[in-house]
Amino acid sequence: VQRHSEIASTCLEEPPERYLCLHFAPMACLYYRLSLLARDGKWDKRKRAAVVIPHITNLRTYADAFQRYLVSPMGRLSASGLADAGLSALLCLKAEESMDTLGITGFSVITYGKVPWDKNQTPRTGSIDFQDVRPETLDRFSLAWKCLGNRTLILQQKDPAAKGNGKGETLLARSVTSPVRGLISENISAGKPWYQGFSALFTSKELARRISYEREGLFAMVSEIVWDLSSEEKFVEAIHQAIRFRFGKLASQAKERNERPPFDREFERMRTGLMRAKNAQTLRAELADFFSRGGINPVLQEDWRQVLGIMVQPDWQKARDLALLGLASYKGKGVTELQKELEAETTSSEEEE
C-alpha cells in the first residue's frame, strides 16, 4: 500500500502470512465520535473521529473484554480528544475486572477529520500511544467520567424530504462531550496534575460559557477527588468562599434597588481579571483584589499559610489554574441564576452549529 504515489517512503509492506490478521484487525478496534472544542469555542473539525487500536497479547481474553464495548450505549461512544477516547475505551473494556485480565498491554489512538487544504478527504490528524496505564490513572479518569459524563442534546432540524402540511422537522439526538474531561484525561495520562492548563478553557467568553455546563460536575469532582496537596484543595475552597460573599453582596444590593443581580457581569469580570494576569506579580495583585472583595473568609483565616503558599510559589500558572477551577466549580449563592443565563446563550449557539 502506498499512501502517496509520488513519495516512495510512504509505501507500506507486510508479509503474506499477516494478511488474514490485517484483514480482520479493524473488527477488534474501538471507534469513538469526537467533539473537541477549539479556543474560539467552536467544534474542531480536524478531530471528528477516533480509532482506538489495542495492543493485544491474548486474543481470547481480549475477545471476552471486547463484548463490553459491543453492548455500550451510544451515549458513551463519544469523546473529547485523543486521551479521552483512549481512556474511555480502557474503562469500557475493564469494567470491574483487573487490568491483567484484558489481554492487552496498551493501545494507540488515531484521530481523523477535515483539513483546510483537502475538503474531499478525511485524513489522519493526530495520534497517541498508551503503555502500562497505572490503576490510579484509570481510577481518576473513572471519577472524571462519573462527574463529567456525556450529555444528550435534542436538536430540531428541517427535513427537506417532508411533504404535506407538517412542519417538516426531525428531532436529532446529539451526544455532547465534556471539554473539561478532555483536559483532565490529557493531564492524567501524561502524569500531570489533573487541573493543569485549566486556563486554556477560559481563553474566550464563548468558551467559558460552554464550560458553564460543567459546574455541577466540577463541583463534584473537586469535592470527591483525592488531591495531591491539601493546599490545592484549601485554595479552591477559599476561592469558593470569596465568590459566595461577593454574589451575596450583589444580591443584597440588587434587592434594595429592586433590580436583577448582575451575576453574569461579575462572573465575566472575575474571569477576565484572572486571564489578564501574565506573570507572578500581576496574578498576585489580582488574587489580592479578589480576596479583598470577598469579605470575611473563614478558609483564609484558618488555613492562610496553605493558601498563601499557592499564591507566592514560583509556578504562578498553577495558582491561576486553581483560581479559575474554583470559579468554574463554584456552587452556592447566585449560581442558579447565573447558570440559567449562561446555559441559555450556550444552548442557542450549539443549536446553530
What are these regions (language model features)?
Residues 2-174:
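Domain-exit/linker segments immediately C-terminal to small folded modules
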Residues 102-353:
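Long, contiguous all-alpha helical interaction modules
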